[in-house]
Amino acid sequence: MSSFLPEGGCYELLTVIGKGFEDLMTVNLARYKPTGEYVTVRRINLEACSNEMVTFLQGELHVSKLFSHPNILPYGATFIADNELWVVTSFMAYGSAKDLICTHFMDGMSELAIAYILQGALKALDYIHHMGYVHRSVKASHVLISADGKVYLSGLRSNLSMISHGQRQRVVHDFPKYSIKVLPWLSPEVLQQNLQGYDAKSDIYSVGITACELANGHVPFKDMPATQMLLEKLNGTVPCLLDTSTIPAEELTMSTSRSAANSGLSESLAPSTPRTSNGDSPSHPYHRTFSPHFHHFVEQCLQRNPDMRPSASTLLNHSFFKQIKRRASEALPELLRPVTPITTFEGRQSQDHSGIFGLVTNLEELEVDDWEF
């Protein structure tokens, strides 16, 4: 992964492709002038940030410099330009895993593609946990895929150190800041906010939720009020993979799309309008069967008792990953077809700041502001 010069003049800002961080962050596609490479530039208005926000950002930058792993998205450059903090990363041409399920795999991805994606994320998590941190924001939008099929975990902003005064703490109690978008992925013990606290096993629960998200095409507990979601999780409601083993046979005869699915909680699915226009009755999108290994993997991740969840290193040896025979960079581009990475851009920035002609059509599908690099 490239490193870049920490000088604003080295970057030609092309178009705004996202916003974030309480609308104080602008995400630009940019061209790195020395090489012509396309990059993502995250610009944060420091003058508008509160002291708490600045401290939060300092923690993120500290973590980014501390971590070095093939599956963690590195920051190519960080520097101050005028009143802005600039964070430069390589452009992820496949976008995030969430982008893929939102635009191409709306009823879920193939099991093998999910295995490659989760393996990359777990390798990153294993490293983060060994470094004494909890990620606290594992979800599909924070799993990015480069043009050559490599998997990167992002979202370092939410990482929390479990080391205090030189000693590793057994648990921590801090609730993630600015975490409203990540609530469906958070474990019961994080949401509970009690004296028992939580540890790195809370990330494993999030891996299980992310597995369901990738397989079902939507995150469990989707659109559920926060209070109800908390009650469901504390009462032991366990999401699952939607397939022939978890959906009643009579419901599989209905033509149902993910828009009618109810959060992957293995309850009744209401019928929706058939997808074909020629009068044929299409098959149910969840009329498929995931392997017992995949089901067991998810069940292990979503154990209510965090002590019963395997560690990231243990999960990497799970039978679910035995189906992987090649490197992700070799296999993922094939498994993601017909999706092709965004590698070419036409035109230049217009005077009315509307962006690059011909580019927005491609980029508008990417929820870049949710990548949180």
Swiss-Prot record:
Query: Which UniProt keywords are given for this protein, alphabetically ordered?
Result: Cell cycle, Cytoplasm, Nucleus, Phosphoprotein
Skewed-composition ranges (Polar residues): 255-281
Annotated region Disordered: the residues are 255-288
MF-aspect GO terms:
ATP binding; protein kinase activator activity; protein kinase activity; protein serine/threonine kinase activator activity
- What name appears for this protein in its UniProt entry? STE20-related kinase adapter protein alpha
Per the record, the domain comment is: The protein kinase domain is predicted to be catalytically inactive.
Q: Where is the Protein kinase domain?
A: 11-321
Database matches in PROSITE patterns: PROTEIN_KINASE_DOM (PS50011)
Alphabetized PANTHER family for the sequence: SERINE/THREONINE-PROTEIN KINASE FRAY2, STE20-RELATED KINASE ADAPTER PROTEIN ALPHA
Record GO cellular component, one term: nucleus
The protein's location, in the record's own words, is:
Nucleus; Cytoplasm
Q: Specify whether Disulfide bond is a keyword of the entry.
A: no
Modified residues annotated as Phosphothreonine in this record:
T361
